């Protein structure tokens, strides 16, 4: 039975006990968040979500408006332990175009500068590797967020990042305009990722 459900016996027993006692396990909460993200991004069709049950990560794929339509994969990994933070977002891209690679790197650096200037509280950690931009995800500690609120915050953030990155790469917005759009979106959001 555990094998059919894509898990092991120990995890299955834990889940059965949690269901029986009406306790939401960290694993179930992560799965609920991913289901909610899937529902939130599906109508826009800019991001294609994918996640497998009983995993702590999901991916969202997006196509760039560029010569050969390269894809960007957003990988959201959530931690079960709140003390480690919420999780991390990795933006993974593969391209042979030196120009596109340079433009994406410039955007990632711009994004970090914007967040450094406008986020208060816990500062996220960033890393930029060949073909990968990583950012930690946290929520302000002043509130116990529901799965729906967390999913909304993550989906809003990824959609904003994707929309502004595509616009930047297409030359539609200058860095000051990207910053203004970022700030306007931050003011509208109920839960702000930090």
Predicted features and spans:
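Charged, low-complexity intrinsically disordered regulatory/assembly segments
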Residues: 94-194
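Amphipathic, interaction-prone secondary-structure segments
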Residues: 48-101
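Short, surface-exposed, polar/charged, turn-prone segments marking secondary-structure boundaries
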Residues: 15-17, 40-42, 119-120
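Terminal, compositionally biased segments
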Residues: 3, 7, 25, 188-194
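Short amphipathic alpha-helix starts
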Residues: 1-2, 17
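Short, basic amphipathic alpha-helical segments that act as recognition/interaction helices
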Residues: 7-30
